[in-house]
Swiss-Prot record:
Function comment: Catalyzes the conversion of glucosamine-6-phosphate to glucosamine-1-phosphate.
EC number(s) per entry: 5.4.2.10
Domain of life: Bacteria
Tagged with keyword Phosphoprotein: yes
Modifications the protein undergoes after translation, according to the UniProt entry: Activated by phosphorylation.
Protein name per its UniProtKB record: Phosphoglucosamine mutase
Gene: glmM
Location of Phosphoserine modifications: S101
Catalytically driven reaction(s): alpha-D-glucosamine 1-phosphate = D-glucosamine 6-phosphate
One of the record's GO cellular component terms: cytosol
Cofactor note: Binds 1 Mg(2+) ion per subunit.
Length: 450
């Protein structure tokens, strides 16, 4: 991570931290960096989610791109993975998504994709940051024919929708409940599932610029759970603001999280001989029950740090085609290069059709262990050294011995705050409370600030 770019681009409160002035500079400097690494005039796709600040930041960003001669294709409201798909398939130099994903409406973000559809690499981001930190903007200022051109490209949305439909199966009137989070999937999710011959019930499809992720979507699935029960739907599908993640709901109204979704799709691919190296890439936060279910099926695991960025890195490095996070980011590399909630939803319904099983039957193969997470405030300098404290190392070792393999402890530093996170999983709530509270008490006594 750099000074401006985090693990998911540049984020901040719109018009406060992430200002139009900064958006202009990101467009101008980002466009210039792109132009230095290819011949000819770069072609860049730009899209946004439904936040009220989206058009403001889009206008500034586009102005910056045009000021250095970039050919800009404006996609309007589109899911983040839609940008990734179009960049790859339409030979663009790069893509830019304006979104803060599952964050509330007051936030926004700007994320760059390279011409390969993957998030821009660290080296390119560092070049942009160096220009942002320069004392003076000394970049060329072309005029007349040297300026960039702007093309409105709303047909990009339909191209992305058509692609998604080709990855699925006719659902034969299956009842599907959708929650589009009042975000980027507000139009596309409806279109896609109608094209797949589903009978749909929809919430979260009335964005007003302020209601994105507000009580709806993958981080607030309660309304979708109720809708599934009321409508008698076979499945509920909740996306987030930019539709790069999915949380599902079974026909009984119970949550099917990213771990279970990955297991269901992974087992299906494994049985067909289509799971690359018979391996699923996951993070340290995936539930122990997920790991045990994979072991039972003979499916391998590759485990990374928290963050879809690290999952994708591992997939690219070793040629894996399925990975993701408990939070609902699922990457299916055979189809797209980033987490894609709508694509994942389609693959989940495909498994239901081909197996003839309900979602609850498929999900029941994974027994999720109760999990508890406690954040403890510590000095920033100590959060990476906690395991060097003898008393902390000793209590963790003692608790792990008591678990005897039927539980899991994870103590890790926050990547962004002066916090130490203590997490445990165990067969019962009482056990998990005991393990976490015991470790947390020792951590607080040794290095805690509260």
């Amino acid at each position: 991570m750099g000074k401006y770019f985090g693990t998911d681009g540049v984020r901040g409160e719109a018009n406060v931290g992430l200002t139009p002035e900064l958006a202009f500079k990101l467009g101008r400097f980002g466009g210039y960096v792109l132009s230095q690494h290819e011949t000819g005039r770069p072609k860049v796709f730009v899209a946004r989610d439904t936040r009220i600040s989206g058009e403001m930041l889009e206008s500034a960003l586009v102005a910056g791109l045009l000021s250095v001669g970039i050919e800009v294709y404006k996609l309007g409201v589109l899911a983040t993975p839609g940008v990734s798909y179009l960049v790859r398939t339409e030979n663009a130099s790069a893509g830019v998504m304006i979104s803060a994903s599952h964050n509330p409406a007051l936030d926004n973000g700007i994320k760059f994709f390279g011409g390969d559809g993957f998030k821009l690499d660290d080296a390119r981001e560092a070049e942009i940051e160096a220009l942002l930190d320069a004392a003076e903007d000394t970049l060329p200022r072309p005029s007349a024919e040297g300026l960039g051109t702007l093309v409105d490209y709303p047909e990009g949305l339909r191209k992305y929708e058509k692609f998604l439909v080709t990855t699925g199966l006719d659902l034969g009137g299956m009842k599907v409940a959708l929650d589009a989070a009042n975000g980027a999937a507000a139009v596309s999710a409806r279109n896609i599932f109608l094209d797949l011959n589903a009978e749909i019930a929809v919430i979260g499809d009335q964005p007003d610029g302020l209601n994105i992720n507000a009580g709806v979507g993958s981080t607030h699935p309660e309304q979708l759970q109720a809708l599934v029960r009321e409508s008698g739907s076979a499945i509920g599908l909740a996306f987030d603001g930019d539709s790069d993640r999915l949380i599902a709901v079974d026909e009984n109204g119970d949550i099917v999280d990213g771990d279970k979704v990955m297991y269901i799709i992974g087992k299906y691919l494994s049985q067909k001989g289509e799971l690359a190296k018979n391996t699923i890439v996951t993070t340290v936060m995936s539930n122990l029950g997920f790991h045990k279910a994979l072991d039972r099926e003979g499916i391998n695991k590759a485990v990374t740090a928290v963050g879809d960025r690290y999952v994708v890195e591992e997939m690219r490095k070793n040629g894996y085609n399925l990975g993701g996070e408990q939070s609902g980011h699922v990457i299916i590399m055979d189809y797209n290069t980033t987490g894609d909630g709508q694509l994942t939803a389609i693959q989940l319904t495909k498994v239901m059709v081909e197996t003839g099983k309900s979602l609850s039957e498929l999900a029941a193969e994974v027994t999720i262990y109760p999990q508890k997470l406690v954040n403890i405030r510590v000095e920033n300098s100590m959060k990476d050294k906690a395991m060097d404290v003898p008393a902390i190392a000793a209590i963790i070792e003692k608790m792990e011995a008591e678990m005897a393999g039927n539980g899991r402890i994870l103590v890790r530093p926050s990547g962004t705050e002066p916090l130490l996170r203590v997490m445990a999983e165990a067969p019962t709530d009482d056990e998990v409370n005991y393990y976490v509270d015991t470790i947390a008490d020792v951590v607080r006594a040794e290095i805690g600030l509260d």
